[in-house]
Amino acid sequence: MGQSGRSRHQKRARAQAQLRNLEAYAANPHSFVFTRGCTGRNIRQLSLDVRRVMEPLTASRLQVRKKNSLKDCVAVAGPLGVTHFLILSKTETNIYFKLMHLPGGPTLTFQVKKYSLVRDVVSSLRRHRMHEQQFAYPPLLVLNSFGPHGMHVKLMATMFQNLFPSINVHKVNLNTIKRCLLIDYNHDSQELDFRHYSIKVVPVGASRGMKKLLQEKFPNMSRLQDISELLATGAGLSESEAEPDGDHNITELPQAVAGRGNMRAQQSAVRLTEIGPRMTLQLIKVQEGVGEGKVMFHSFVRKTEEELQAILEAKEKKLRLKAQRQAQQAQNVQRKQEQREAHRKKSLEGMKKARVRGGDEEASGIPSRTASLGLGEDDDEQEDDDIEYFCQAVGEAPSEDLFPEAKRKRLAKSPGQKRKRREMDRGRGRLCDQKFPKPKDKSHGAQARRGPRGASQDGGRGQGRGRPRKRVA
């Protein structure tokens, strides 16, 4: 019999391949898409649609609660390898979209001029193409008109490029490109158009009948005499099935693409179908850091050099005060630790001295204060156990003459000393809280006939006495 299962070499190769895949996945940029504040149902749905665009390199089931601050999200993003935050928020007048780069910034703040959800875009199309396999790979980013219009435009282009993994046009697998994200910059209006498309590659140069045969759904040829009628005239096909192609979307494929008729070095047409969402954005400001920092660019506010210098000085003063508070807090913590350590040492020394003093008193024969007052804990527990045993066996409290030491020890206790706990654990029963009754015409002979623990010798069933009552839990 041959060896079953994989060999050692196969297992090692599989483990190395998995490790390489994990490293490659971790090297790609990842993102969080969420909302902040009271945004409403439509903005929340827009955030879900944008999250759909960023798949699969995003947290698809991310839930951010109201009590979670931005610092909490940043703290979680570090161990998970998240590099970007896409945050949607809403005020009374406008909707804002923030793009943050972690961990040190910058932060780009956009105003959402117009937007359309996925359901709005899909409902306006006659035929839409959207399936789950399209979202197994990140989209292809296309930037248009991001020319030399300023440093802020260049920064925007860099931020959008870093959202997705880079590709090598000579080594990329065309089967992994299923979607396209187009961002177009209009220099006149200074607005960005955000569009999301689905990519479909179809062969060209074939008749409509041949295209119909290549589709998965076979056409109805019950009215035809021969298949040549379908290929020659395209009978039974509507004019709406013919999609116009031209030089703008026809190209020669460098490699075979999934689909019927898409062979290598053959002419094929690349068709785009919008699947949403849409957004029209306008850059408001660029900040250093994550959410808070120096404003490097603002579309509406222009500050002079004096104002910028005053802002810088105020920020430096704030940082100095913060450093002073942190230093003072560290000193306070150190001082409290030293005080705690000194108190602990002093307590240990006192306990040691008390132990030595007690040993000297025992060696010299001087009774302690507790022993002189007759308040030994062992004697108290012994006496209380005897009283409890008598109550359980006889069913009533013992007489005062039977346990004379109990009363004397209670009287000897100082007022400040805690009384012994009267109620014992549930498993041991309860002590009798009744006072010692005076003896009623009982002779010394009757008392002498009792056992060593106060119980009668006949098992508690003396003359005129019934069975002992059950112990009260």
Curated annotation (Swiss-Prot):
Pfam families: Brix. Residues 335-360, 422-444 have a biased composition (Basic and acidic residues). GO terms for biological process: ribosomal large subunit assembly; rRNA processing. The modification Phosphoserine is found at residues 238, 240. Its main location: nucleus. Residues 376-388 have a biased composition (Acidic residues). GO terms for cellular component: nucleolus; preribosome, large subunit precursor. One of its GO terms (molecular function) is rRNA binding. It is found in: Nucleus, Nucleolus. Residues 407-421, 464-473 have a biased composition (Basic residues). Residues 29-292 form the Brix domain. Residues 324-334 have a biased composition (Low complexity). InterPro entries: Brix, PPAN-like. Coiled coil: none annotated. Keywords: Acetylation, Nucleus, Phosphoprotein. Residues 323-473 are annotated as: Disordered. The modification N6-acetyllysine is found at residue 438. May have a role in cell growth. This is Suppressor of SWI4 1 homolog. It comes from Pongo abelii. The gene is PPAN.
